[in-house]
Amino acid sequence: MDFDVVSRRLARLRALMQEKKTDAFVLLVLERLNSENCHYISGFRGSSAALIIDGEEARLITDGRYRTQAAKQSPFSLTVQADLPLPAYVAKAVTEKGWRTVAFEAEKVSHGLFEAVLRPAPTRWVDGSAFIPSLRRSKDDMEAGAIRAAAAIARKAYDLALERVKPGMTEVEFESLALSEIKRWGGEKG
Protein backbone atom coordinates (compact mmCIF):
# COMPACT_ATOMS: atom_id res chain seq x y z
CA MET A 1 0.00 0.00 0.00
CA ASP A 2 1.17 3.52 -0.79
CA PHE A 3 2.63 5.21 2.31
CA ASP A 4 0.90 8.47 1.31
CA VAL A 5 -2.47 6.71 1.58
CA VAL A 6 -1.51 5.45 5.06
CA SER A 7 -0.44 8.98 6.05
CA ARG A 8 -3.77 10.47 4.94
CA ARG A 9 -5.72 7.80 6.82
CA LEU A 10 -3.58 8.34 9.89
CA ALA A 11 -4.27 12.10 9.75
CA ARG A 12 -8.01 11.40 9.61
CA LEU A 13 -7.73 9.03 12.59
CA ARG A 14 -5.79 11.62 14.58
CA ALA A 15 -8.45 14.24 13.83
CA LEU A 16 -11.09 11.80 15.11
CA MET A 17 -9.01 11.08 18.22
CA GLN A 18 -8.79 14.81 18.91
CA GLU A 19 -12.54 15.21 18.39
CA LYS A 20 -13.19 12.32 20.83
CA LYS A 21 -10.61 13.72 23.28
CA THR A 22 -8.40 10.64 23.40
CA ASP A 23 -4.65 10.82 23.91
CA ALA A 24 -3.94 7.59 22.06
CA PHE A 25 -5.53 4.78 20.09
CA VAL A 26 -4.61 1.10 20.45
CA LEU A 27 -5.37 -1.67 17.96
CA LEU A 28 -4.52 -5.32 18.57
CA VAL A 29 -4.24 -8.12 16.01
CA LEU A 30 -4.13 -11.54 17.63
CA GLU A 31 -4.12 -14.62 15.38
CA ARG A 32 -5.48 -12.57 12.45
CA LEU A 33 -8.45 -11.25 14.44
CA ASN A 34 -8.72 -7.58 13.43
CA SER A 35 -6.08 -7.76 10.70
CA GLU A 36 -8.34 -5.86 8.27
CA ASN A 37 -8.40 -2.75 10.47
CA CYS A 38 -4.65 -2.99 11.03
CA HIS A 39 -4.03 -3.17 7.28
CA TYR A 40 -6.39 -0.28 6.60
CA ILE A 41 -4.71 2.14 9.01
CA SER A 42 -1.06 0.95 8.84
CA GLY A 43 -0.61 -1.01 5.60
CA PHE A 44 0.66 -4.05 7.56
CA ARG A 45 -0.84 -7.48 6.79
CA GLY A 46 0.60 -9.72 9.52
CA SER A 47 -1.34 -12.04 11.83
CA SER A 48 0.09 -10.65 15.06
CA ALA A 49 0.55 -6.95 15.81
CA ALA A 50 -0.28 -4.01 18.00
CA LEU A 51 -0.66 -0.43 16.81
CA ILE A 52 -0.23 2.45 19.23
CA ILE A 53 -1.06 5.84 17.79
CA ASP A 54 -0.92 9.25 19.45
CA GLY A 55 -0.65 12.79 18.11
CA GLU A 56 3.05 12.48 17.24
CA GLU A 57 3.86 8.83 16.69
CA ALA A 58 2.37 5.75 15.10
CA ARG A 59 4.05 2.59 16.36
CA LEU A 60 3.72 -0.96 15.02
CA ILE A 61 4.73 -3.75 17.39
CA THR A 62 5.09 -7.25 15.98
CA ASP A 63 7.25 -10.32 16.42
CA GLY A 64 10.49 -11.07 14.61
CA ARG A 65 8.80 -13.14 11.88
CA TYR A 66 7.37 -9.94 10.46
CA ARG A 67 10.33 -7.55 10.81
CA THR A 68 11.09 -7.28 7.08
CA GLN A 69 7.45 -7.42 6.00
CA ALA A 70 6.42 -4.70 8.47
CA ALA A 71 9.21 -2.38 7.34
CA LYS A 72 8.15 -2.79 3.69
CA GLN A 73 4.40 -2.52 4.24
CA SER A 74 4.07 0.24 6.83
CA PRO A 75 5.58 3.67 7.49
CA PHE A 76 4.88 3.25 11.23
CA SER A 77 7.81 3.14 13.68
CA LEU A 78 8.62 -0.52 14.27
CA THR A 79 9.20 -2.30 17.56
CA VAL A 80 10.08 -5.98 17.36
CA GLN A 81 8.42 -7.92 20.15
CA ALA A 82 10.98 -9.81 22.17
CA ASP A 83 10.36 -10.45 25.85
CA LEU A 84 6.68 -9.58 26.39
CA PRO A 85 3.37 -10.62 24.84
CA LEU A 86 1.83 -7.95 22.58
CA PRO A 87 -0.84 -6.81 25.05
CA ALA A 88 1.83 -6.39 27.73
CA TYR A 89 3.82 -4.13 25.36
CA VAL A 90 0.69 -2.02 24.97
CA ALA A 91 0.15 -1.75 28.73
CA LYS A 92 3.84 -0.88 29.22
CA ALA A 93 3.72 1.85 26.54
CA VAL A 94 0.53 3.34 27.99
CA THR A 95 2.09 3.41 31.45
CA GLU A 96 5.36 4.95 30.21
CA LYS A 97 3.62 7.63 28.13
CA GLY A 98 1.25 8.60 30.93
CA TRP A 99 -1.75 9.02 28.65
CA ARG A 100 -4.93 9.83 30.53
CA THR A 101 -7.47 8.55 27.98
CA VAL A 102 -6.77 5.74 25.53
CA ALA A 103 -9.23 4.39 22.97
CA PHE A 104 -9.14 0.71 22.08
CA GLU A 105 -11.35 -1.58 20.06
CA ALA A 106 -13.41 -3.12 22.85
CA GLU A 107 -15.36 -5.22 20.37
CA LYS A 108 -12.12 -6.93 19.29
CA VAL A 109 -10.51 -7.50 22.72
CA SER A 110 -11.70 -10.30 25.00
CA HIS A 111 -12.88 -9.40 28.48
CA GLY A 112 -10.20 -11.66 29.99
CA LEU A 113 -7.42 -9.95 28.04
CA PHE A 114 -8.70 -6.52 29.00
CA GLU A 115 -8.96 -7.39 32.70
CA ALA A 116 -5.60 -9.16 32.90
CA VAL A 117 -3.41 -6.87 30.84
CA LEU A 118 -4.96 -3.59 29.81
CA ARG A 119 -7.09 -2.52 32.77
CA PRO A 120 -4.14 -2.41 35.22
CA ALA A 121 -2.47 0.31 33.12
CA PRO A 122 -3.05 3.67 34.82
CA THR A 123 -5.33 5.22 32.21
CA ARG A 124 -8.99 5.65 31.36
CA TRP A 125 -9.84 3.17 28.61
CA VAL A 126 -12.64 4.18 26.24
CA ASP A 127 -14.31 2.20 23.49
CA GLY A 128 -12.92 3.21 20.11
CA SER A 129 -14.49 0.29 18.21
CA ALA A 130 -16.21 2.69 15.80
CA PHE A 131 -13.08 4.74 14.97
CA ILE A 132 -11.69 2.72 12.04
CA PRO A 133 -15.11 1.67 10.63
CA SER A 134 -16.17 5.32 10.57
CA LEU A 135 -13.06 6.15 8.51
CA ARG A 136 -13.63 3.18 6.20
CA ARG A 137 -17.16 4.32 5.28
CA SER A 138 -15.74 7.16 3.18
CA LYS A 139 -13.71 5.75 0.29
CA ASP A 140 -10.46 7.37 -0.79
CA ASP A 141 -9.19 7.39 -4.40
CA MET A 142 -7.25 4.16 -3.95
CA GLU A 143 -10.29 2.31 -2.58
CA ALA A 144 -12.59 3.68 -5.29
CA GLY A 145 -10.12 2.51 -7.94
CA ALA A 146 -9.87 -0.93 -6.32
CA ILE A 147 -13.68 -1.21 -6.28
CA ARG A 148 -13.87 -0.30 -9.99
CA ALA A 149 -11.13 -2.82 -10.83
CA ALA A 150 -12.84 -5.55 -8.79
CA ALA A 151 -16.17 -4.84 -10.51
CA ALA A 152 -14.53 -5.13 -13.94
CA ILE A 153 -12.90 -8.44 -12.97
CA ALA A 154 -16.17 -9.76 -11.52
CA ARG A 155 -18.16 -8.79 -14.63
CA LYS A 156 -15.64 -10.39 -16.99
CA ALA A 157 -15.37 -13.54 -14.86
CA TYR A 158 -19.16 -13.86 -14.56
CA ASP A 159 -19.68 -13.43 -18.31
CA LEU A 160 -17.00 -16.01 -19.12
CA ALA A 161 -18.39 -18.46 -16.55
CA LEU A 162 -21.92 -17.98 -17.98
CA GLU A 163 -20.65 -18.98 -21.43
CA ARG A 164 -19.64 -22.36 -19.95
CA VAL A 165 -22.91 -23.13 -18.11
CA LYS A 166 -24.49 -26.43 -19.16
CA PRO A 167 -27.82 -28.06 -18.29
CA GLY A 168 -27.45 -30.17 -15.16
CA MET A 169 -24.54 -28.14 -13.80
CA THR A 170 -24.72 -27.60 -10.03
CA GLU A 171 -24.33 -24.27 -8.24
CA VAL A 172 -21.07 -25.54 -6.77
CA GLU A 173 -19.73 -26.28 -10.25
CA PHE A 174 -20.74 -22.81 -11.47
CA GLU A 175 -19.14 -21.24 -8.40
CA SER A 176 -15.93 -23.11 -9.19
CA LEU A 177 -15.98 -21.78 -12.77
CA ALA A 178 -16.64 -18.22 -11.63
CA LEU A 179 -13.90 -18.31 -8.97
CA SER A 180 -11.46 -19.78 -11.47
CA GLU A 181 -12.15 -16.90 -13.87
CA ILE A 182 -11.85 -14.33 -11.08
CA LYS A 183 -8.39 -15.66 -10.21
CA ARG A 184 -7.40 -15.88 -13.87
CA TRP A 185 -8.18 -12.18 -14.37
CA GLY A 186 -6.31 -11.02 -11.25
CA GLY A 187 -8.90 -11.19 -8.49
CA GLU A 188 -8.17 -12.37 -4.98
CA LYS A 189 -10.21 -14.43 -2.60
CA GLY A 190 -11.66 -11.91 -0.14
Model-derived segments and spans:
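N-terminal accessory/capping or targeting/presequence segment of soluble
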Residues: M1-T95, A152
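Flexible, acidic/His-enriched mid-domain "rim/lid" segments that flank
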Residues: D4-L10, P85-G190
